[in-house]
């Protein structure tokens, strides 16, 4: 059976004890994760952003969901319900953005990203839920229509009615975000999980050619500019947004890996 995680520096390691410090030594390779996802999928992007924010080196591999690789027997051995992306560290596996983001955040360098204050934690989760439930489905449709469908079928004719309906449906949550950002640098004040969720969706919205939905809202645009230059939450000199796949990367099915030079 094909090993879908046979990529990157972690896959080339032959001795777990030498690479993962089981004898007690903390070694750099202990922090190399393997992320298997797709560049046109928001959940994959969220996990990449989280890995940068938490200072975690990550080797990225592409799971070709256009060709149905997420439904293959090899992938279902890793993720029985077909959740994408999937993460591996040593002999540990987890699939789905929620589990992966939580694992990386707990596993990462430095302080925790989630706020300790109960009210702020609730607010973070509220805005994360809005992103996933009210924005995600419509962004996914736009990405499918504008990018992925044409990758699978070069003569595909976009469904204009569905595109227009998705754009219209995005107005209310984007307006709400615009109001929220009138008083905050980041969505709940400090950078949080909520910013990661929204960054992934709005990045793909922009790459799908629908960036006017961002730029026509001044506070959202200013926030988007800030997250586009936001350095690692854990203090490393690396910007997550710089590693997110652009349109050409999506079409070429390419994902960037994360290299941390300053632990």
Positions of predicted regions on the chain:
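Short, solvent-exposed turn/loop segments enriched in Gly/Ser/Thr/Pro and often Arg
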Residues: 38, 64, 193, 239-243
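A late-sequence structural motif
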Residues: 230-231, 236
């Amino acid at each position: 059976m094909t090993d879908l995680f046979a990529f990157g520096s972690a896959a080339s390691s032959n001795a777990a004890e030498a690479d993962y410090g089981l004898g007690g030594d903390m070694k750099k390779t202990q922090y190399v994760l393997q992320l298997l996802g797709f560049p046109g999928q928001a959940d994959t992007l969220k996990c990449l952003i989280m890995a940068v924010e938490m200072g975690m080196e990550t080797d990225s591999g592409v799971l070709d969901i256009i060709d149905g690789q997420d439904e293959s027997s090899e992938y279902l051995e890793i993720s029985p319900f077909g959740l994408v992306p999937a993460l591996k560290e040593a002999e540990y596996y987890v699939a789905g953005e929620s589990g992966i983001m939580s694992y990386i955040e707990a596993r990462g360098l430095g302080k925790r990203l989630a706020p300790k204050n109960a009210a702020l934690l609730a607010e973070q989760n509220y805005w994360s839920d809005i992103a996933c439930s009210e924005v995600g489905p419509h962004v996914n449709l736009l990405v499918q229509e504008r990018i992925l469908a044409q990758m699978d079928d070069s003569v595909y004719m976009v469904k204009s009615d569905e595109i227009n309906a998705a754009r219209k449906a995005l107005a209310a949550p984007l307006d709400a975000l615009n109001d929220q950002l009138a008083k905050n640098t980041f969505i709940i004040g400090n950078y949080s999980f909520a910013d990661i969720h929204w960054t992934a969706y709005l990045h793909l919205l922009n790459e799908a050619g629908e960036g006017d939905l961002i730029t026509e809202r001044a506070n959202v645009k200013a926030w988007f500019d800030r997250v586009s230059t936001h350095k690692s939450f854990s203090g490393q000199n690396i910007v997550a947004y710089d590693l997110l796949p652009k349109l050409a990367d999506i079409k070429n099915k390419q994902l960037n890996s994360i290299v941390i030079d300053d632990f």
